[in-house]
Amino acid sequence: MEDSSEIKVETASSRTSWIQSSVAAGGKRISRALGYITGEMKECAEGLKDKSPVFQFLDWVLRGTSQVMFVNNPLSGILIVIGLFVQNPWWAIAGCLGTVMSTLTALILSQDRSAIASGLHGYNGVLVGLLIAVFSDKGDYYWWLLLPVIVMSMSCPILSSALGTIFSKWDLPVFTLPFNIAVTLYLAATGHYNLFFPTTLLQPVSSVPNITWSEIQVPLLLRAIPVGIGQVYGCDNPWTGGIFLIALFISSPLICLHAAIGSTMGMLAALTIATPFDSIYFGLCGFNSTLACIAVGGMFYVITWQTHLLAVACALFAAYVGAALTNVLSVFGLPTCTWPFCISALIFLLLTTNNPAIYKLPLSKVTYPEANRTYYLTQERNRRSSTITKYQAYDVS
């Protein structure tokens, strides 16, 4: 009887260990599978190196499409393109053409191949194509509009290279400055009364807006969060914004989180200065804050609770800068584009502090927030171990 009970105990324990090992193995397989589609999808890029150049170019274009939101992931790029078609197929066509021409121009100019492969010469092009279509007063499918889309998107790698030469002295990214310069020049050169390429008429506010606080609609305020994220690409469809959030979450949950926080901060900041409700509902107060919050919240700074608060502050700052520039540029009939984001993010990245928890990453080491933190923690462990070894050697001597 004792032997049989011992056998039963051994059988139960072996079965438990087998279940535990199976669960652990299954968890590793799931983690490995998720690793293929999350983050930067390095395995995809490596696997395409010996494939047709067409597939490689498509990968670069998709990464460029998602790099607008600091995401280097072709799957996210596919979802973003789908979101653009949900918003407006004509805008999507113009945006895709802008990315293709911008990436192709970078190849012709022999720009850094790794930067091209990461989509860093495509994201300004997609924004140029989209915003030229968005601000066109000719309506959809005005095919002649593709001419300025091609020309202005081809100027983006030139502007990126020139600005990169200057900004590299401070180890700063160029962000969307090439897009801002290209689109602002185009809109200033054409205008509403242009014969070939008329643009939407933008005018400054000439009267006090009629704001009744009791009429504010909370559901529309909540909807403004995904809409504000969609407005990064000039889209006001909440479904498109939701698709963009999914695209961000696939690559980096931290980017997704800070995008939502940034859009929310932009909305709240707009309420504090009595911005007309329609502008808030359409997400026009949230997109610059979205980008600013992502940039500081783990992208170029290692994510800590201190940099998280700094990201929130940067989002609020970008919202107020955006309100100021909207009033100034509307006098000239120009939109703010993402000038407020660029100004705010660059100011916060030039911040100097003795707080070790606010650590700005070298530009060459920036990937995505989760990997950035892993890199930082590894560097810290290596530094501490080398310091301990040095002190031990000193004690021995």
Curated annotation (Swiss-Prot):
GO molecular function terms noted in the UniProt entry: urea transmembrane transporter activity
Main location per the UniProt record: membrane
Subcellular locations according to the entry: Apical cell membrane; Basolateral cell membrane
GO-annotated cellular components: apical plasma membrane; basolateral plasma membrane
Activity modulation comment: Inhibited by urea analogs and phloretin.
Membrane spanning stretches: 68-85, 92-109, 115-135, 143-163, 172-192, 239-257, 264-280, 287-303, 309-329, 331-351
Glycosylation sites recorded in the entry for this protein: N210
Pfam families: UT (PF03253)
Sorted UniProt keywords: Cell membrane, Glycoprotein, Membrane, Transmembrane, Transmembrane helix, Transport
Tissue distribution of the protein: Kidney.
Mode of membrane association: Multi-pass membrane protein
Catalytic reaction(s) noted: urea(in) = urea(out)
InterPro entries per UniProt: Ammonium/urea_transptr, Urea_transporter
Function: Mediates the transport of urea driven by a concentration gradient across the cell membrane of the renal inner medullary collecting duct which is critical to the urinary concentrating mechanism.
PANTHER family: UREA TRANSPORTER (PTHR10464), UREA TRANSPORTER 2 (PTHR10464:SF6)
Record family assignment: Belongs to the urea transporter family.
Name by which UniProt lists this protein: Urea transporter 2
Organism: Oryctolagus cuniculus (Rabbit)
Source species taxonomy: Eukaryota, Metazoa, Chordata, Craniata, Vertebrata
